[in-house]
Amino acid sequence: MTAPHTAPARVAVLGGTGFIGRVLGARLLAQGAEVLSLARKAPAEPAPGRFVAFDLSNGDPAELTALLDRERIDTVVNAAGGMWGLNDEQMYQANVVLTERLIEAVAAMASPARLVHLGTVHEYGMAPVGTSQRESDPAAPVMEYGKLKLAATEAVVRAVEAGRISGVVLRLGNVVGAGQPGHSLLGVMAAKLDAARAAGETAQLSLQPLTALRDFVDLTDTLDAVLLAAADRSAPPVVNVGTGSASTARHLVELLIEESGVPTEITEVPAPDGTGPETEWQQLDVTVARDSLGWTPRRTLREAVRELWTAQSTAPVA
């Protein structure tokens, strides 16, 4: 049996070309780990470590088992999945089927790796304003993405409780940091501010009310939690990772404008009918992360937004 606290040395990152996966891979490399980045297709920019194109949502788990054994992988991080640009069936394949096949692949390894699966706060669904969601609270998501992520989490938990694998699900808040996806609200706003900066113009931003409160968490803090969860096999099966406080997306956009220093004119626009948020409130209780992993959020949302802006404004022009 692997010691409870063993730093990962040979790590496979599914979704290794994505927002979290790419930065995680780079950090692992910097810490001396060997990294195998896996994704459906080769990225435009090289992924951290060695890259292998592998679409597990349509692939054979036995092939992945053979690859993981051959690479002597001791930790697998599932940063794959998603919702943007996908229909319900594609989301099911990318989130549920992929996770089930990953569990099968890891369980069949000659020396099964530790699995760290990245879940989401959206698995909780509706929550009363002012409350903090605990891992033991009933999860009742309304939106399809939350339902599918919950199904993936439940598959991991079942496998852990049955002794098939050593694993943990990190239920992440809304992660903010360098490399923010361009289709996200902050990614879109950062791109518009950067375009105005480059042109020497005033940025013109149209903003909906954005009054729903969310638990946003810094990317670097998130990576800290991933590494701690990978190293500690005694952690409980589900652990929340967030700041433990709720903020509006509007607040983060305002922080982004301040950090950019770009003159900005804001036009207030109503939200389209039928596009309201799943819930007006998300706030994670992170007590379990503190007690089981020794993790607490250290960085402010301003620091997270600052890193987002620095990465956006210094990126080479495509």
From Swiss-Prot:
Binding site for substrate: T120, Y145
GO molecular function annotations of the record: dTDP-6-deoxy-L-talose 4-dehydrogenase activity
Binding sites annotated in the UniProt record for NAD(+): F19, I20, D60, P61, N95, T120, Y145, K149
SUPFAM superfamilies listed in its UniProt record: NAD(P)-binding Rossmann-fold domains
EC number: 1.1.1.344
Gene3D superfamilies cross-referenced by the UniProt entry: NAD(P)-binding Rossmann-like Domain
Keywords assigned: NAD, NADP, Oxidoreductase
Catalytic activity of the protein: dTDP-6-deoxy-beta-L-talose + NAD(+) = dTDP-4-dehydro-beta-L-rhamnose + NADH + H(+); dTDP-6-deoxy-beta-L-talose + NADP(+) = dTDP-4-dehydro-beta-L-rhamnose + NADPH + H(+)
Classification via InterPro entries: Epimerase_deHydtase, NAD(P)-bd_dom_sf
Active site: Y145
One Pfam family from the record: Epimerase
First-level EC class: oxidoreductase
Function text: Catalyzes the reduction of dTDP-6-deoxy-L-lyxo-4-hexulose to dTDP-6-deoxy-L-talose. Can use NAD(+) or NADP(+).
Family of this protein: Belongs to the NAD(P)-dependent epimerase/dehydratase family.
Annotated PANTHER family: DTDP-D-GLUCOSE 4,6-DEHYDRATASE-RELATED (PTHR43000)
The protein, known as: dTDP-6-deoxy-L-talose 4-dehydrogenase (NAD(P)(+))
Species this protein is from: Kitasatospora kifunensis (Streptomyces kifunensis)
